[in-house]
Amino acid sequence: MQTIIWNHLSETEKRKVIMRPVQQNGKNIQQAVNAIRENVAYNGDRALFELCEKFDGVKLDKLIVSADEIQAASSRISVKLRNAIEQAKTNIEAFHKAQQNQEIDLEIQEGVRCQVVTRPISCVGLYIPGGSAPLFSTVLMLAIPAKIAGCKKIVLCSPPPISDEILYTAHLCGVETIYAIGGAQAVFAMAQGTESVAKVDKIFGPGNAFVTEAKRQVAQNSTAIDMPAGPSEVLVIADESADPEFVASDLLSQAEHGADSQVILVATCETLAKETALAIERQLALLPRAETVRKALNHSRIFIAESLEQAVEISNEYAPEHLIVQTKNARKLLPYLDNAGSIFLGAYSPESMGDYASGTNHVLPTYGYTKTYSSLGLADFSKRMTVQELTPKGFKNLAETVEVMAEAEQLAAHKMAVSVRLAKLNI
């Protein structure tokens, strides 16, 4: 990791050094995803079977995972892992239940009543990546709030063969239907519907560049998505009180997600920065994914800040997905931290806790989107509607205001909708 003293940089250099690595979502990916979209649209299930054999090397005779398969998978989960998943589920449920909306019902002025009511999104689709390290924890993060929100139908797609952990967790969380479908084709199947796959209203979940491009495309049509996605990232703010072994472990735990991940350390102490760099090398030697981690570290940075105030400024400008604060009084910085997907305060709040079991959601905006997007929560699985109801007296008292404004905007029919009612009022 390159070490840079922040105050030695010009303003132009500062902007450049906090830029993310360029995402490889080029024309080739877009063209490949376009072809998949057309194939699924025209050929439905047949396309899904063909693409599964082509990309996953699995020849399926059905797309829906049976109850017997789910039960068999669940029986293979160890008691130790079951207990861990259930503990995480309990914590995540508690935190997301606390997010339930309070209904708003106000009399704005006499005879004018306004409300906000919340309704669940009817049908949601969850995408869970497969591969050598199946993300069953993401099932918890998506299915639990969907269930609490009251979504009527929850379906899940994951590339075959689906791991026992994903099947068990999905069943535990109340997912109704599980499809053995992966990649961009899963996104298009859920967005468009096929003979076997239910059309959904909103799609959630992470994925590779092809899945991300497919989500971008469906979001331009009639299917909503959770948020824009990019490579995973973490920024750590640390002062002289931080333990370099802790800081190193937090940076490495994020770097192991992928070669395109980025990790940033903003330290107020050069000694800590040097000790952390040495700790990274020691710990790296123990990791099975060391090659991937090294690639991520190649475009990662250590910044030396002159103060915690400057460290906060750097963090707010970078706007990380994960922000870890390892300082003497970490909570005191919280009021000044404006842009982050999830914040981890103190030496004993590693990102791993939020990734799995503290209760917060690990589905977070990346690539600087935390300046405008929030971490996933209960609100993402529902929508708000406003309601207004006026009595004749309330209508009359507000009528002139609306007529004047409608006339000023030259919307005569808007004014008329008020005038015809006024003419029939006897109050």
Swiss-Prot record:
Keyword Manganese set for record: no
GO molecular function: histidinol dehydrogenase activity; NAD binding; zinc ion binding
GO CC terms, sorted: cytoplasm; cytosol
Keyword set includes Zinc: yes
Domain of life: Bacteria
Pfam family, one: Histidinol_dh
Ligand binding (Zn(2+)): 254, 257, 355, 414
Listed pathway(s): Amino-acid biosynthesis; L-histidine biosynthesis; L-histidine from 5-phospho-alpha-D-ribose 1-diphosphate: step 9/9
Amino-acid positions noted as binding substrate in the UniProt annotation, renumbered to this chain: 232, 254, 257, 322, 355, 409, 414
Co-factor binding comment: Binds 1 zinc ion per subunit.
Reactions it catalyzes: L-histidinol + 2 NAD(+) + H2O = L-histidine + 2 NADH + 3 H(+)
BP GO terms, sorted: L-histidine biosynthetic process
E.C. no: 1.1.1.23
Keyword set, alphabetical order: Amino-acid biosynthesis, Histidine biosynthesis, Metal-binding, NAD, Oxidoreductase, Zinc
Cofactors named for this entry: Zn(2+)
InterPro entries listed in its UniProt record: Ald_DH/histidinol_DH, Histidinol_DH_CS, Histidinol_DH_monofunct, Hstdl_DH
Protein task: Catalyzes the sequential NAD-dependent oxidations of L-histidinol to L-histidinaldehyde and then to L-histidine.
Family: Belongs to the histidinol dehydrogenase family.
The name this protein goes by in its record: Histidinol dehydrogenase
Organism: Haemophilus influenzae (strain ATCC 51907 / DSM 11121 / KW20 / Rd)
Gene name linked to the record: hisD
